[in-house]
Amino acid sequence: MTLIAFELSGETPEIPTAEIVGVLESENIPFSFKCQLEQVFIIETPGIDAGLTDILASRLAMTRHIIEVSGVSPANLTDIISMAEKVDFSNLNSLTYIVRAKKIKRKSHISSEDIERGIGKVLYDRGYRADLVNPCIQYRAIVSDNTCIFGPVIASIDSSAFERRKPHNKPFFYPGVLMPKLAQALVNIARVKEGSVVLDPYCGTGGIMVEAGLIGASTLGCDVQRKVLIGAKINLDFYSVNYSLMFQDAGSMALRNNCVDCIVTDPPYGRSALIQARSLDTLMQDSLCEMYRVLRPKGRLVLVSERPVETWAQNAGFRMADLFTQRVHRSLTRRITVLDK
């Protein structure tokens, strides 16, 4: 069995781990939870090959690095060096290396530089060659909650693509939409994978559909505002994803029963929006019943709201799977409700 550590980005305490679990489950990667430290999530698995590593690296939005754990020690320099001396580095052979250390929220009294020098000396004394510019392997030591997790980095996540897909960088911009990093995380929590059919019944400018489509899902979107539907088409065409758009009310969708695998949506609840002569509460009740109807058995709905929706969801037939909160600013805290059929 292999220990795998995920170094998390730290935007929220719970969403990053939930998206990791969602991707592992969607890709049928066997694993068991080992432990969690601040901004570090550790699992045990029979092994992750290069193909699965590439999938994880391309999917995860709120992870920075994935590490194959070689050693664990208390977070003091003596124990860290002692741990490194027991690590088998024979897989390096003639490859070059670099050692990098990260202190989570800088709570430890030892410096990252001392950790890097201490572990680097262990490798140097064994005859291995460092390369600070273009190393073949990066070893990473993460210090969190008085514990040091050490091992080679098997994948790093490039977040620059999410920056490039921010709403103001897309061909069609409309305010008040989710950032792509969060949208991708919610898609992962919904257990979307390549080939899934994903519905966003309040699709707006198509931000969630873009993230699901880039995974390889077939996406469906509904909205009652023609302007934003046209904008969604512009954005979806720009990213060349597989999509269908429908001008229709989320409370009465022209879709057959049990026809979608996953639903990920950010309804206009509590915000100014064009709603066809009904209250937002009534719309939410009706749309949750419709989402339950069109979702396949064992499918998952991930819904963003500003008020509790649990009662309406349970009345529609859903089972609560999880609930997360994300503070946006002083007057807005998002509720992310995960519901299973």
Residue spans of the language-model regions?
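Class I S-adenosyl-L-methionine-dependent methyltransferase catalytic core
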Residues: M1-M62, L77-K86, I104-I115, D125, ...
